[in-house]
């Protein structure tokens, strides 16, 4: 277990350092025009070929330069767009290229976002986790790593509230402002740059889908043939349903986890106060579990939506509105298939996040059905006031004693209420009585012997 603690601790610290490095690289103003350069290289094939040739001739020195990276991304997106109407093998190969070029950037942006929003809590938790793990290794305490994570999370929240409440409040206010900006303000900047990350791409796609539906509906309204008008209208409904499903699911995965995290952090002090009352500690455990689940959905949903938005933008042909006018059915099925595929890929993220949450709940809270000290005290009190096995066997009869005492029906426990004041619960917990498992009685499955009902001869009455 000590080796697992070291491995997980090293991985967590590496992720934090990667997040800080990624944040520094994202804040660089030269990186803001990366998408514009990719679009320019995607349109200028001659310049893209020159850059790709130069990068392939000297891969050791120029492979990691921004021009080479942008050229490779533009080449992957161009190949995927060209293969949208070709064979399945070429489409899947170019899809793999697009994923390979877009996935690192999306994961990097997700790490930066989580590091920015939860920086005070994360660094307090990591400091305490290092201290607890070091103490466990030095003192040779055999404690599971989940115990360190659970206690470090609680102590980090309490410490951040006690020592720097202004930073905790600023974290909550920043989350509220972010959600309010998503719901009210424009998702794209006036100059066309991406102002809200993945939501800017969703806004652009929503504008494109609205134009497609308007074009198809206009064709249906202007067509004098009723049969053709119905076909145009069906195409418009198919495009609206597929694009609307993708937009609703992607926007919900981007907005709802952040909203839930902000709400839970704002209610954090209230749930931490409940730790003082043993009967209400299960509410604090439920709050921590909900916070972890929301963070998992935020960490998985944001890069997935951004990655699929990039792939969908590269897969849709550039002249799709003109194709709607010439070949409406085939163009409609192409757009609907791409949107439905992206929606199904997002839907597969839900069971993945649920399985991750279930694993975290089993590892971090192995006794999830155990609400706290109150139930532990009640279990200890029930064992304390339960009748002893000898008394139960004596009350059951002569043939139920000995080996067959466990199969007897025990006598009902006396109706004496267990003490419920907190001092007794803490004393029971401190003395170890609440954590002691109940005594296991050896059970014998053999039936009880039948009583001897033979008639014995009476003894003669001798004088």
From Swiss-Prot:
Query: Is Protein biosynthesis included in the keywords of this UniProt record?
Result: no
User: Mostly located where?
Assistant: membrane
Biological processes annotated in GO: protein secretion by the type IV secretion system
Domain of life, per the record?
A: Bacteria
The annotated topology with respect to the bilayer is: Multi-pass membrane protein
Q: Does the keyword Phosphoprotein apply?
A: no
Ranges of compositional bias, category Low complexity: 376-410
- Give the subcellular location: Cell membrane
The record's Gene Ontology cellular component field reads:
plasma membrane
| Residue ranges of the region described as Disordered | 376-463
Q: List the disulfide bonds.
A: none
Cite the entry's keywords alphabetically: Cell membrane, Membrane, Signal, Transmembrane, Transmembrane helix, Transport
Q: Which residues form the signal peptide?
A: 1-24
Q: Where is the composition biased (Basic and acidic residues)?
A: 441-455
Bias type Pro residues, positions: 411-420
Q: Where are the transmembrane segments?
A: 118-138, 232-252, 253-273, 294-314, 333-353
Q: What is the induction comment?
A: Cotranscribed with ptxABCDE. Activated by the two-component regulatory system BvgS/BvgA.
Q: What does this protein do?
A: Component of the type IV secretion system ptl required for secretion of assembled pertussis toxin (PTX) through the outer membrane.
- Name used for this protein in its record: Type IV secretion system protein PtlD
Q: What is the lineage of its organism?
A: Bacteria, Pseudomonadati, Pseudomonadota, Betaproteobacteria, Burkholderiales
Q: What gene is behind this protein?
A: ptlD
């Amino acid at each position: 277990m000590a080796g697992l603690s070291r491995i997980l601790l090293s991985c967590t610290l590496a992720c934090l350092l990667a997040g800080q490095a990624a944040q520094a690289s994202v804040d660089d103003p030269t990186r803001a025009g990366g998408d514009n350069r990719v679009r320019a290289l995607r349109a200028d094939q001659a310049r893209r070929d020159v850059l790709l040739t130069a990068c392939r001739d000297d891969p050791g020195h120029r492979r990691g330069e921004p021009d080479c990276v942008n050229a490779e991304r533009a080449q992957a997106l161009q190949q995927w767009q060209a293969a949208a109407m070709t064979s399945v093998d070429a489409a899947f190969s170019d899809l793999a290229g697009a994923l390979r070029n877009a996935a690192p950037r999306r994961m990097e942006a997700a790490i930066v976002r989580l590091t920015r929003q939860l920086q005070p809590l994360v660094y307090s938790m990591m400091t305490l986790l290092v201290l607890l793990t070091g103490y466990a290794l030095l003192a040779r305490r055999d404690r599971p790593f989940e115990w360190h994570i659970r206690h470090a999370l609680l102590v980090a929240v309490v410490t951040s509230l006690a020592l720097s409440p202004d930073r905790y409040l600023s974290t909550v206010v920043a989350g509220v402002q972010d959600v309010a900006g998503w719901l009210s303000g424009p998702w794209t900047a006036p100059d066309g740059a991406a102002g809200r990350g993945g939501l800017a791409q969703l806004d652009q796609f929503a504008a494109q889908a609205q134009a497609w539906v308007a074009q198809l509906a206009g064709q249906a309204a202007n067509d004098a043939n009723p049969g053709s008008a119905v076909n145009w209208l069906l195409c418009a409904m198919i495009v609206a349903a597929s694009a609307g499903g993708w937009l609703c699911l992607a926007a919900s995965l981007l907005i709802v986890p952040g909203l839930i995290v902000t709400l839970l952090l704002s209610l954090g002090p209230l749930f931490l106060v409940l730790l003082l009352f043993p009967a209400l500690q299960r509410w604090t455990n439920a709050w921590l579990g909900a916070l972890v689940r929301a963070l998992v959905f935020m960490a998985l949903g944001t890069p997935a939506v951004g990655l699929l938005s990039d792939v969908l933008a590269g897969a849709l042909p550039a002249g799709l509105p003109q194709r709607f006018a010439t070949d409406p059915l085939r163009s409609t099925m192409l757009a609907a298939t791409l949107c439905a595929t992206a929606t199904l890929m997002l839907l597969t993220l839900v069971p993945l996040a649920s399985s991750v949450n279930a694993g975290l709940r089993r590892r971090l809270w192995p006794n999830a059905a155990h609400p706290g000290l109150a139930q532990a005290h009640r279990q200890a009190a029930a064992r304390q006031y339960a009748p002893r096995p000898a008394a139960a066997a004596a009350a059951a009869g002569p043939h139920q004693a000995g080996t067959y005492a466990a199969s007897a029906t025990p006598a009902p426990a006396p109706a004496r209420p267990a003490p419920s004041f907190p001092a007794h619960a803490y004393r029971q917990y401190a003395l170890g009585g609440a954590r002691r498992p109940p005594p296991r009685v050896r059970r014998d499955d053999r039936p009880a012997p039948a009583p001897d009902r033979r008639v014995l001869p009476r003894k003669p009455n001798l004088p």
